[in-house]
Structures are given as structure tokens and as C-alpha cells.
Amino acid sequence: MNRPGNELLRQMVSSHLFGTPCGASRFFLVFLSLLCISTSSIADDTVVVRVSNSDFRTAHDGLIEAIESEGLVIGSILPFRDMLARTAVGDGALPYGEAEIVQFCSALLAAELVREAPAQLTLCPLSIALYTQVENTSEIRLAYRSPGNSTAGRQRAESLLQRIVQRAAELARLRW
């Protein structure tokens, strides 16, 4: 049985609001698709650079020098693999041969970021991970989370991270 109120609602949703029969369904499918696309791009914000022909200690030293050559000071170096090994549950199989995270900050960049939007304080300190994987300990990887390029400050942060990682990889190869 078709009620008058149901018919009115069906007409509003299918033709008046969206212009076609079943338009609402198409609208929501498109909306959900766009939501999934943007979620994928947000989740895929890690930049990884592989360093061949080096070892972990040399790559570590190259990373420290590359950060300091930008006039920045290291805030901390987190021994990530060791921390994970101490706190891991289960069988304890770790994917890393070695892994650490180097944190640093630029006061000028931090000030610019928070002037643009106070919540951007979450971008500081910047960090770059340095690691090898168990199955290939001769290949060192440098990785960082891209801050994106939606503001001028984020673009400068991305450029800084790119310069540091490229310089660190170059130093690691040259010194090995």
C-alpha cells in the first residue's frame, strides 16, 4: 500500500532534489566514493627514500649532519626498534633490523605553522625515521610523514624534509 506521504517523499528525493529517479542513491554513492578517495590519500602520506651502498651507522650520521646543516638542533633520537622489542606482545617477530626516529624542530617554521593555524602545532617536532628491514638489512630507508602543501608553512616543511632526506641519502652513499 502506497501512502500519500511516502509518495511525496519518494518524489522529493528522486526527482526534485537530485533531478533523476534514484538520484539520491547516486548522490550518496558518489559522495561515499569521494570520501574513500580522500581517506586513501590522507592515509598514504609517508614518503620513503631507499639508500643503497651504505650501512645503518653511516646513514644515521648522514641524517644528523643533514639536519644540522639546515641550522637545526636534534630534539631526540628514539631507538624505535629497541623500544618495540621491549614492549612487543605475541611472538616478538619484528620487521626491523634496526630502526630509529630522529626528531627536530625549526623555531621559524613552527612559528609560521601555528600562525597559519594553531592546530598545526601537531606538525612539530618534525621527524624522520631511519630503518632497515629484517629481510634486507643492507638497504637503509629514510621515511617521513608529509605535512602536505595546503599552506605556505606546510610547503616549507615539506621542502625542508625533502632536502634533509636527499642530503642524508647522498652523504650515506658518499661516505660508505
Question: What does each model-found stretch correspond to?
Answer:
Residues I42-G71, S76-L78, E170, L174:
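Terminal, regulation- and interaction-focused segments at domain boundaries
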Residues C105-R156:
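Surface-exposed, polar helix/loop patches in the mature regions of secreted/periplasmic/lumenal proteins
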Residues L29-L35:
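Sec-dependent N-terminal signal peptides
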Residues A43, L78, P95-Y96, Q133-N136:
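Short, ordered beta-strand-loop transition motifs
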Residues P79-L123:
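Compact, glycine-rich, soluble single-domain proteins
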Residues S38-S40:
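N-terminal signal peptide c-region/cleavage motif recognized by signal peptidases
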Residues M1-A24:
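N-terminal secretory signal peptides that target proteins for export/translocation
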Residues L142-W176:
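C-terminal partner/receptor-binding element of secreted or periplasmic proteins
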